[in-house]
Amino acid sequence: MAKRVGIVGIGIMGTAMMRNLVKDGFEVVGYDIAEQAMARLAEAGGITAASPRDVAEKADIVITSLPGVDAFEQVIAGQGGIASSNGKGQIVIECSTLPIDVKARGEVRVAAQGKILLDCPVSGTGAQAARKDLVVFVSGDEAAFERCREVFAGISRAQKYVGTFGNGSRMKFIANHLVTIHNLSTAEALVLGEMAGLDPALVYDVIADSAGSSRMFQIRGPMMVTGQYDEPTATMTTHLKDLDIIGKFAADLHCPTPLFNTAAQYYYAGVAQGRGSQDTGAVCAVLEKLAGIERKG
C-alpha cells in the first residue's frame, strides 16, 4: 500500500514538493484554492481534497506551504481548517515563511485538538525544490520530526533539526537575509562587468568558479545573463513579504543590518517598476536601468 501524505498550498514550492513525493511513491492528497493548482495535482497523479480539513482527515502527515499570514490562519483555524479535522495525532509540517508569533498561535490551535505543528521553513528556490535540493530547518516536537523523516527525505536533500519551536523560522530569516544580499551582489557584479565591456556570459563562467562566487551567483547568475525572469523560482512580490518579516525580526532584536537594509530597497524598486511577478533575479534589471544599460527587457 502506498504511503500517504497531505499537502495544502500547491504554488511554486508546493508543486515541486508534491511532484517529488509522487515520484518517491507517496500517495499525495492535496488542496489549494486555485483551480490551476488542483489541476496540477491531478495531472501528477495526486488526489484532490475538498478542504484543508479533508486533507488532514485523509493523511496523518500534512505539509503546508502558504503565501502569507491570511492563508495560514484560514488553513489552520478557518472554516474547513486543519484544526477542525477529526482524529488526533496528525502532524502538520509547516514550511511557509511567516512571523514566528503567527505560527505559534497556529501551534497552540492545533495542539488543543490533539495535533502537532512543526515549524519547518525550507531553504532553496523553486528550481532547487523541483530537483529536491532543499534544506529543511525543522523545529518543534523532536519525536514528531523522527516520525516524518521519510516525508522530509521526499522533498529535500537535507533536514536540520534546530531545536524548540520557532528556531526553524529564525534560521530561515537568517538564510533569506543572506539570499537578499547575495542576490543583489550577483546583479551588481554582472552589471559592473557589463559596464567594463565584458561579456556577461564570460563573467558568469569565470566568477562562478572563483572565490567570489556564491550559491545565489550560481543559481541566479544564468538568468541575469539572459535577462529572462518570467519563469520565477521566487517572485519579487513574495520576497517583499519576506523582507518585511526579516526587517521586523532584526529590528525587534536591535540588530544592525546595514547591508540588508540597503539591498531591500532594490527589490521594492523592482516591484514599483512592474516586476512583481518576475523572479527576484530581476533585481539585475533594476540595476541595469540605473546604469543606463538597455541590454535586457
Give the predicted meaning of each segment.
Residues Q273-G297:
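NAD(P)-dependent dehydrogenase/reductase Rossmann-like domain
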Residues I10, L98-N176:
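Rossmann-fold dinucleotide-binding core
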Residues P52-T64, G68-I116:
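Rossmann-fold NAD(P) dinucleotide-binding segment
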Residues M1-E57, I61-T64, Q90, G126:
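NAD(P)+-binding Rossmann beta1-loop-alpha1 motif at the extreme N-terminus of oxidoreductases
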Residues V28, T48, L117-L118, Q159, ...:
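Hydrophobic beta-strand scaffold residues
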Residues S169, R215-G276:
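Interdomain hinge/lid region at the active-site interface
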Residues K132-S139, K160, T164-A196, D205-I219, ...:
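Active-site-proximal catalytic alpha-helix in oxidoreductases
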